[in-house]
From Swiss-Prot:
UniProt-recorded name of the protein: DNA-directed RNA polymerase subunit Rpo1C
UniProt subunit comment: Part of the RNA polymerase complex.
Lineage: Archaea, Thermoproteota, Thermoprotei, Sulfolobales, Sulfolobaceae
Catalytic activity reported: RNA(n) + a ribonucleoside 5'-triphosphate = RNA(n+1) + diphosphate
Gene3D superfamilies xrefs: 1.10.150.390
Keyword DNA-binding on entry: yes
Role description: DNA-dependent RNA polymerase (RNAP) catalyzes the transcription of DNA into RNA using the four ribonucleoside triphosphates as substrates. Forms part of the jaw domain.
Provenance organism: Sulfurisphaera tokodaii (strain DSM 16993 / JCM 10545 / NBRC 100140 / 7) (Sulfolobus tokodaii)
Gene: rpo1C
GO CC annotation: cytoplasm; DNA-directed RNA polymerase complex
Primary location group: cytoplasm
Length: 392
């Protein structure tokens, strides 16, 4: 245990280096020093703090370091080793998830919707240890239409009627009863109708105001696509055990809809749809999600890339307050330099547009200076040195 005297000494020592280390590093250092089981002396504290300052300063980049190029090659080179497949979600046969290079391209292209949108929904303490309660929430979330709970539907053009046979197993699986299905149908705007039961799971709907086959088949489509319950976009919700708690994995994503459900832990909910995160929780959350998703994709392929390279990509994609792709319609296409834009793609168009607008090239970046053969402002090129020569 750390004595009270050493605790106060740690606080005083950390206060003295506040200008040398970021607040987060100081906070982590404080927790490590105060929670240790070793009996620390003043000398030990000084050595640990000096070592932390030294390590931090050595980890900083040198002035003029080409961080963009280093990040590009550090992510791009491992990216060449990635697979081009869609995998089954671990332990769940029904769900697929895009991994590897296709997923990385989705992220940096800032696609509006991922090819395999998935959510991981954590539950509050009241629900996460009880499988039945978790299933109850999963049923509330899963988007269910009438076509999902029927075994057959037949159209009788003689009597202008539609007969629906409900699937007992599917009703049980979705947590729906026949009476609620009939109640929903009776509330639809179908004109004047009459519902007659054949048995517990079969009933016929007679349309008394329809007199042509085309209208009857339109009613059939309307019935099949009628929502019974759930959140739009969530095609499937599966309860899975993670450690000692139950979580819900979904096929499909609707962050705004799910966070309103009682029992969902809003602080831990996850989705692989970056734009949904930006719209619901803001751009800072989207930045974190971009970094997390890229890191996850690389780690799944057994590739180790320093988090700082990934954070640079996330920062560039979100610096304007909206999520932008890295490409001609995003970061690269919006560079202030005419020559840099022209060097990337559609050269003639960029040059003509810039000439028509009377744009000025200021030669502040890397590409434009290389094009005209000037030293770039990176590395030693960032230093402007004047020497005074003693001329005799």
């Amino acid at each position: 245990m750390v004595s009270d005297y050493i605790k106060s000494y740690i606080e005083r020592s950390l206060e003295q280096i506040r200008d040398k280390l970021p607040d987060k590093v100081i906070q982590d250092l404080r927790e490590a020093l105060l929670n240790t089981d070793i009996n620390l002396t003043e000398s030990d504290v000084d050595k640990i703090i000096d070592l932390a300052v030294k390590d931090y300063q050595e980890s900083l980049i040198e002035p003029g370091e080409a961080v963009g190029i280093v990040s590009a090659q550090s992510i791009g080179e491992p990216g060449t080793q990635m697979t081009l497949r869609t995998f089954h979600f671990a332990g769940i046969r029904e769900l697929n998830v895009t991994l590897g290079l296709p997923r990385l391209i989705e992220i940096v292209d800032a696609r509006k919707t991922p090819s395999t949108p998935i959510m991981t929904i954590y539950l509050t303490d009241e629900y996460k240890y009880d499988k039945e309660k978790a299933l109850e929430i999963a049923r509330k979330i899963e988007y269910t239409k009438i076509e999902n709970v029927i075994s057959s539907i037949s159209v009788d053009i003689t009597n202008m009627s539609i007969t629906i046979q409900l699937d007992e197993e599917m009703l049980k699986d979705k947590g729906v009863d026949p009476s609620s299905v009939k109640k929903i149908i009776s509330k639809l705007k179908l004109g004047k109708i009459r519902i007659e039961d054949i048995d517990d799971y079969t009933f016929t709907i007679y349309f008394e105001e329809i007199d042509n086959i085309s209208a009857l088949f339109k009613m059939r489509e309307k019935l099949l696509n009628t929502k019974i319950k759930g959140i739009k976009g969530i095609r499937r919700a599966i309860v899975q055990k993670k450690g000692d708690e139950y979580v819900i994995i979904t096929d499909g994503s609707n962050l705004e809809g799910v966070i309103g459900i009682k029992g969902v832990d809003v602080n831990k909910i996850q989705t692989n749809n970056i734009h949904e995160i930006a719209d619901t929780f803001g751009i800072e959350a989207a930045r974190e999600a971009i970094a997390r998703e890229i890191k996850k994709v690389l780690e799944e392929q057994g590739l180790d890339v320093d988090m700082r390279h990934i954070l640079l990509v996330a920062d560039i994609m979100t610096r304007t307050g909206v999520v932008r792709q890295i490409g001609r319609h995003g970061v690269t296409g919006e560079k202030s330099s005419v020559l840099a834009r022209a060097a990337f793609e559609v050269t003639v168009k960029h040059l003509l547009d810039a000439a028509a607008r009377g744009e000025m090239e200021e030669f502040k970046g890397v590409v434009e200076n290389i094009i005209i053969g000037q030293p770039i402002r990176l590395g030693t090129g960032i230093v402007e040195l004047t020497m005074r020569l003693n001329v005799r």
